[in-house]
Amino acid sequence: MSESSTYFEKQRDMLIQEIGVSIESVVYNLDILNRSLNGSISVGKEFDNVGRLWSHFYDGLNQLKERNNQEETNKNDQGDANDDDSSSDEHGSSDEEIDQDQEN
């Protein structure tokens, strides 16, 4: 029975050694992954300022577009109001002309 226990112990020691090597490999690969992730994060942080700059740029463009649209709307509204006034003046004068023609 001592031979079987020694065989068992040898197999157990070999398996423990394989497990140890595998764990070391996993730890090594996790370290590499950690470095890669840290590098990616640092590169991403470098673009934060550039991203904010572009965001401000597009916000400014949108504000300009909104102002231009409001100005055009205001001009169109004023133009429509002026057209209405001038058309009523035209109608008023034509009514007066009709009244004068009828008197004559």
UniProtKB/Swiss-Prot annotation:
Among InterPro entries, the record links this protein to: DASH_Dad1
Subcellular localization is given as: Nucleus; Cytoplasm, Cytoskeleton, Spindle; Chromosome, Centromere, Kinetochore
Q: Which residues form a coiled coil?
A: none
Q: Which keywords does this chain's UniProt record carry?
A: Cell cycle, Cell division, Centromere, Chromosome, Chromosome partition, Cytoplasm, Cytoskeleton, Kinetochore, Microtubule, Mitosis, Nucleus
Composition-biased stretches, type Acidic residues, lie in 95-104
For whether the record's keyword set contains NAD, the answer is no
* Keyword Methyltransferase annotated: no
Region: Disordered, residue numbers: 65-104
Q: Which GO terms describe its molecular function?
A: microtubule plus-end binding
GO terms under cellular component: cytoplasm; DASH complex; mitotic spindle; mitotic spindle pole body; spindle microtubule
Output the superkingdom of the source species.
Eukaryota
- Bias (Basic and acidic residues) occurs at 65-78
The UniProt family comment states:
Belongs to the DASH complex DAD1 family.
Any idea what job this protein has? Answer: Component of the DASH complex that connects microtubules with kinetochores and couples microtubule depolymerisation to chromosome movement; it is involved in retrieving kinetochores to the spindle poles before their re-orientation on the spindle in early mitosis and allows microtubule depolymerization to pull chromosomes apart and resist detachment during anaphase.
Q: How does it assemble?
A: Component of the DASH complex consisting of ASK1, DAD1, DAD2, DAD3, DAD4, DAM1, DUO1, HSK3, SPC19 and SPC34, with a stoichiometry of one copy of each subunit per complex. Multiple DASH complexes oligomerize to form a ring that encircles spindle microtubules and organizes the rod-like NDC80 complexes of the outer kinetochore. DASH complex oligomerization strengthens microtubule attachments. On cytoplasmic microtubules, DASH complexes appear to form patches instead of rings.
Query: Know the name of this protein?
Result: DASH complex subunit DAD1
Q: What is the lineage of its organism?
A: Eukaryota, Fungi, Dikarya, Ascomycota, Saccharomycotina
Gene designation per UniProt? DAD1
